[in-house]
């Protein structure tokens, strides 16, 4: 096996029945490609469906729900262990609510084969409902602002663009790509410890992409590949639990990566001394995280004043859990990173607050954002 395409399923039997046949057909002629379903202890008959309608597809059935992060980590570990010397070179994480197009996989394999510096790549993500329009979760590749707010080429806040090929000829490198469909180099995934299981679900792919870049790899979008995403297959957009995960995990992601990123900026542009750069990077990261938490507090007040009490509580609980779960920033770890950081570049971090730029300055499409406003690390 060269490429393992893995659906992590939890109670999405209907999506499997609808979209799995097309996925199987799409990779049938690709040598070394195998579709695998890992089930997170579903209670809707998903495993029975696999046994009865798709006996040719390998199914890994977990006894409990490990979440998106733990489920994929455990699935990949089992696949690698069973494969032995034939372990896959690439893993594809793909949601059950994805409809693939013909020839979606080949361009990604070709890109990864010819670009060993690429740690992960993804197709363009279109809406399943509006097929000429980007989909919220990933569009044409993700960026992030200096406070950790993600946005995309083709989607800023809630404004989603039609795909008219406007981003097809841009530099394919982005900051993150959606976990709805993400091809990762298995060796890199393993070296980085996989997905951070503290996240459970949501934002974990952005954290992984950030860690890949800090390890010297790039993240790319492949415009010759397009898939169609239903979205909200596991948690609806209005779910307070989803809101909780997004707020908490964004802070965990900043805690994981921001100090190293700022220290790299100081080290490369101002002070080639690891200890000074590490101190300044940690100070800047801690200040940014405090500012982000104040911003979250403002959004919590908006929820309260608009009588969205469950959303208000979700933000408060997210901050409480973050304080319990954060690892903290270790100066020695940052210094060790800097000593081994030659050639590492972090791109596509927007130097302004994207929420303010969108709401006050009407920057609702990615083309309206100036390239000079991105940090150069």
Where in this protein do the model-derived segments appear?
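Active-site-adjacent helix/loop segment of glycosyltransferases
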Residues: 6, 215-335, 343
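Short beta-strand-to-loop acidic/aromatic patch adjacent to the donor-nucleotide binding site
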Residues: 86-99
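A conserved acidic beta->alpha catalytic loop
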Residues: 22, 39-48, 64
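A short, conserved alpha-helix in the catalytic core of glycosyltransferases
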Residues: 167-226
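Short, acidic, metal-binding catalytic loop of nucleotide-sugar glycosyltransferases
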Residues: 21-32
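Short beta-strand/loop segment that forms part of the nucleotide-sugar
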Residues: 32-41, 60-62
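Glycine-rich, basic loop-to-helix element that forms the pyrophosphate-binding segment
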Residues: 62-83, 107
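Conserved donor NDP-sugar-binding/catalytic core segment of glycosyltransferases
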Residues: 98-149
